Amino acid sequence: MTKADAILWAIAFITGCVFSFFQWGWLGVLALGGMLYSGRRWGGKVWLRLPSSQSFAIATLVALLAMAYVWLRTPQPGVNDISGLVPRLEGLNLPSTVLVEGRVETTPLPNRAGRRRFFLGVERYQNLSPVPAQSGVLQGRASGRLYVTLPAAAGAKLHPSQRIQISGRLYLPRGGGSEFFRAFNFRRQLQLQHTFAGLAGNKVTILDQGSPWGLWALRQRIIQVHAQGLGDRYGAVVSAMVLGNRAVAIPFEVRDSFRRVGLSHALAASGFHTAILLAVVLALTRPLPQQWRYGLGAGVLVLFACLSGFAPSAIRAVLMGLAGLVALVNGQKGQPLVILLAIATAMLIYNPLWIEDIGFQLSFLATLGLIVSAQPISDRLDWLPTPLRNLVAVPLAATLWVLPLSLAIFGIFPVYGLLANVLAHLPLVLLTVGGFISAMVGLLVPPVGSALAWLLYYPTAFLLWLIQTIGQWPGATIALGSLGWLQVVVLYGLIVLVWLSPRWRRRWFLLFTLGVTLVLVPFILRQNTLFQATVLANTQVPTLVIQQPAGTVVINGGDSQGLTAFLAQEGINRIDWAVASDRQYRQQQGWRDIHRITPIRQFTDVPTAKSDPAYREMLATLKVPHQSLPLRQPVQLGQVKITVLRADPAILTLEMGNSQWLFVSDPSRDAAQTDWLAVTPVEPPQVLWWWGRKLTPRLFEIVKPRSVILSRNALDPAIATYLKQKQIPYFVVGEAREVRWQADGSLKANAPQNDGLI
């Protein structure tokens, strides 16, 4: 076996892991392997430079084995897994409320809803019911894990190793998102962490305090040291430089600010931090013997990996650093590309499921970019001063290699990302070094560590001011929409062509123009021709996004995170018409955050009788033209016409092209809207979109819809049976996720845009 063979087989193993994303990926592996085998065996002189045809045959086998390995290592629920309780409760028509005992496995951290989230190792369970005779019908021992969310106050005192008892609603996580780019598939992300059910908890009792020691305790002490010296907000940012964002409760507005300017990596445990720490350690220990220097450097890297919670990106960075130290000890010049390939292969052999981790993917692509592209870019920037040349070349090389995948997942391009990376470099270096030193001192003497952390107050304040200022510049981010997998493959093909071919390297601008065209042309065509409507996967606030050439219409904005993510993936940079179906802040609180990311041109609401002060305050801070929709008078934008039939609660007709929808919100417990519709003539709609509490077959008998969309978690079996008997197609948003209407009148469930070619 030659070195070239080993490299080929390592690449084949990684390729097989990637092809496991596709249901028929094994056919792609066979086709690619057969083409390379045939080309090497019967091709011309160019093919003779490659490894032997036998090596390609072995590589094909390695790729197929890698696919099988991924499938075999994919977690599946055990016989006694707690997730099996959900269908048992449904089968007995029992409430989904349960009492669960188990041990806390991860540190509770806040989610965007303000609740604490963590994983619980399950030991026992018991069902609960308002009817005493039904409680305890199902109980016993169980295995597996639960993804638990708790009110912030209830989860504030929890830590790993505690044995607790929680009551709440047991549920199965939803799928959704792209089948290839699986970043937003909640069910899949939990499955990769050996979790198949969730618990929306409301009450917790601590049964056993568990061990007060562990890595979690070290992390908590570091966080407390920084918080005491800098305050919670600034302290969280500095702690993230040491621990990574997976272990620190960074305020979400700070996370979003870093993301908008292309600096998300600064808050993650990555190679940026390990490179700085290793360089500082080696510089400070220069007077010491060589073995001591390299030993201390290796110790700092291992400690960094432990504190970060062994995130895949941190492991990759630490292994690269250790490999570099080994090369220095042996007096050899390392081959970083070969080392990176070996580390990627070894990590995937250890855990092939890391191939789906976003941090793993972006970390390796960024490192690959630094290895192969940073120096050529720096050479072309010879007109800049040398220090500035390197500051520009490094982030530019990393950005070029991660951009196609980043666009495919998030759909956002940070316009000022390169400038932000250059300007923030010095403060980030200072905070990384200062944060690590204050953390290590704080582990031994907390007051001294906090005093050292206080010295970082003004650098932290400057960094946050800089990031927030750049993020507020006009056009700070552009939503280009999620790329299709073929676009991603072609873009990376162009990048590799520039890297490997000297001939095409000289024509890099031509390939750059081709890549930009490949992204922009589909985006422009889509914005000028697309006409579709999407009911988002939100059962708390019914949300609809209508895309048309005349402008984007959005109905309801209670879920800012879900809505802004959808708008970015669809390439929507402006909301032309925002509509609120009520005047309750609880239902419409997301508009402020949405407007900050995606500007709103016109805001209208249904003139409901109730309007709380928080809602009126939100309207005042929006600073957007506002008016109430008139009763029974259509208001139109392009091909979309909205008419308010009833204001309190809202009943709207939505005319989109030749299709008519009827939106019915019924928050009452007595189906009052059905009674109102019974005495009010309404033309039978093509689509009935319903959201509320109580649903009865009488509503369908009165309205006579052709199709039904229900913004709720689940559907009563009796209602489902009725709709099937009447042959009325229906979609339950809690089960189907996104429901999309096309201009031809068709409805489709869970059809992510970037599963297509473009």
Say what each PLM segment does:
Residues 231-234, 290-296, 427:
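Membrane-interfacial loop-to-helix junctions in multi-pass transporters
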Residues 155-156, 160, 167-169, 210-211, ...:
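Non-globular, low-confidence helical/coil segments that flank catalytic cores
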Residues 16, 43-47, 51, 55-57, ...:
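Hydrophobic alpha-helical transmembrane segments in multi-pass membrane proteins
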Residues 1-6, 211-217, 243-247, 308-314, ...:
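Hydrophobic alpha-helical transmembrane segments
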Residues 25-34, 362-363, 421-426, 484-487:
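Alpha-helical transmembrane segments of polytopic membrane proteins
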Residues 63-265, 565, 606-610, 627-630, ...:
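Membrane-interface helix/helix-cap signal primarily in integral membrane proteins
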Residues 1-88, 97, 316, 687, ...:
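N-terminal leader/targeting segments
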Residues 1-20, 327, 428, 433-468:
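Hydrophobic alpha-helical segments
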